[in-house]
Design a protein with these regions (language model features):
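Extended, charge-rich alpha-helical interface modules
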Residues: 1-81
Length: 81
């Protein structure tokens, strides 16, 4: 949905404890988490009209966000297993 934030705690509520644990213990996860959070914030600002960019730029940012989300989800599942 346009303008909706996609932070990981809302996307994966079942992993809230795991997200917190990995942010504290896994530097790679923490870096990807921070990158995802910043990117999600940027996409949200663009979608709500706070920033103006081309449609191509927005789509590229969304694809990057999705790629990061997939990586983070894989790490969450692996840790929970």
């Amino acid at each position: 949905m346009q303008g909706e934030k996609h932070d990981l705690h809302h996307e994966f509520p079942e992993f809230n404890d795991t997200i917190h644990e990995l942010k504290m213990t896994d530097n790679h996860f923490a870096r990807l988490f921070d990158e995802y959070h910043e990117l999600d914030h940027e996409v949200h600002r663009i979608e709500t009209g706070a920033e103006n960019t081309s449609d191509d730029y927005l789509e590229e940012r969304k694809k990057t966000r999705l790629n990061l989300k997939d990586q983070l989800f894989s790490m969450l599942k692996a840790h929970a297993a």
